[in-house]
């Protein structure tokens, strides 16, 4: 029904509940993306360390 919680009103506007729900979903998505980015950064850091170690071994073998 028009004006019910979560329903789109006849004029096309949304109610406060819908806006709040959208904001919470957006926040969840941003937090999830931040966690993924941090995990990727940590993985990259480990890969760089591994690469540095391999380069050191190569340097030692070629001396």
Swiss-Prot record:
Its main location: mitochondrion. It comes from the Eukaryota. This protein forms a one-to-one complex with ATPase to inhibit the enzyme activity completely. It is found in: Mitochondrion. Residues 18-62 form a coiled coil. It comes from Cyberlindnera jadinii. Pfam families: IATP. Belongs to the ATPase inhibitor family. Residues 1-23 are annotated as: Disordered. This is ATPase inhibitor, mitochondrial. Keywords: Coiled coil, Mitochondrion. GO terms for cellular component: mitochondrion. One of its GO terms (molecular function) is ATPase inhibitor activity.
């Amino acid at each position: 029904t028009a004006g019910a919680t979560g329903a789109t009103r006849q004029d096309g506007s949304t109610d406060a509940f819908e806006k709040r729900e959208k904001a919470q979903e957006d926040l969840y998505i941003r937090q999830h993306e931040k966690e993924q980015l941090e995990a990727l950064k940590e993985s990259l850091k480990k890969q760089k360390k591994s690469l540095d170690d391999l380069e050191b071994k190569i340097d030692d073998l070629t001396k």
